[in-house]
Amino acid sequence: MDAVDAVLARMRADQGLARDRAVDADVDEAVAASPAALAREHASMRALAGTFREETEDALGRRWYAHFERWLCARRDATRDGDAIPSAKRRDARDGGLARSLAKAGRTTGEMATTTRRLARAAAKARANASARASDGRKNRVRARRIEVGGNGKRAEKVELTCGKVTLELNLRHYETLKTRWRGDARRDEDGFHRAVFCVVARYATLQGTHYKAGNMQAAIPPRVFETLEKRFDVRCELFASPLNAHFKEFCSASAMTDRAFGSLGNAFDFEPSEGSFECNPPFDEEIISRLAGHVERLLSRAKKPLSFFVVVPLWHDSRGWMRLAKSVYCVSNTTLEAKEHAFVSGAQHSRIDQLTPSAAPTSVLFLQNKAGEKKWPVTPEGVAAIREAFAPPKKEAERVEKWDPDATSWSCSRRLPKDANSWVYKNKKRDQSVDESPAKTKKKKSAGGGLAASFFRD
């Protein structure tokens, strides 16, 4: 075991996580997530998304879901686990980003206040519905089956998981990866494994707003970048990841309740390493980036042993978080990746056929190190060049997906037709959908039962 492995072993011990895959005492019903509860949370978020769309689509346009995901991230308290549905406060300072977008679209102050009140009421209702307790333990049953999806020359195997009326999908490759991460034995307890997987997929779909195009807040850097970081800077742990997109075995994530069973070290802001080399790619939210800057600086100021952080954030010159990172006394390298010259892996990679997303906006990649870290892992021009090359977008058009641009309108994806259907619109409008539904141009309408029609969530 080398020095870095020893550090990671100590970190896992501090978090109460054994290195083997045996089910530990802490992974019990006291902390285990309930599939029925996560299904209710998912359904409640879909209802909130419907209200957001009704209130804002005329102003924000077809990509309202991107604004919804950012609004959720801004309102959500990043330090609290279990709060996927945001605060129900009528007025919240964190609504500023949404207000600016609405004002830019021509909304008046009074109209924005009305929108805020309606969203607050919808959030309160969603939180109440999500917290309702299931009376029947059978509601936690999860059904799993393999399916094949795709078209236009692109096909992929997926696993479909259903709990109650909520059906979600993930790629077979990610399903198999979760088997290796799970702390139980998937062969001996397949039902338990499927419950755990459903909880993870449902939680992250809810965090993203349940829309099939969402996921920008969970995007990851390309695998080649991780390989370069590990080879040149001994990076073996991610501070902002999930069981669905983590490259390394060691990672922190936003939802310990669902993720600890797959090896998560917990919330990044509760994680306090005293040595080691780490990757930080937080959600592109100004408040989270600002908090990360303070967290990293505090850790570096206290560390006596080598400590290094590779940070990926948007190039927001005027934001408090970016300025604090770029002007920090610990910042030893700050490189700009221009738009279209780098790519990210989709935040919904676990359910999409296409993976890489060329960026339509510039990004900053920074190294923050203490003196010991700077000496142990020097950042050289050759190292920076290798990182830049690893970030390069794919050259083959077939590997591309939509550009990372909130104002873009183009999108392409392959998807199977629903059973017994001859078009992309379901005949049964009450059928529940996953976060990966296909687009169809339909108008907003109500189903016969009074709820939002399935086509409501398609553009």
Residue ranges, per PLM feature:
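Class I S-adenosyl-L-methionine
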Residues: M1-C280, F284-D459
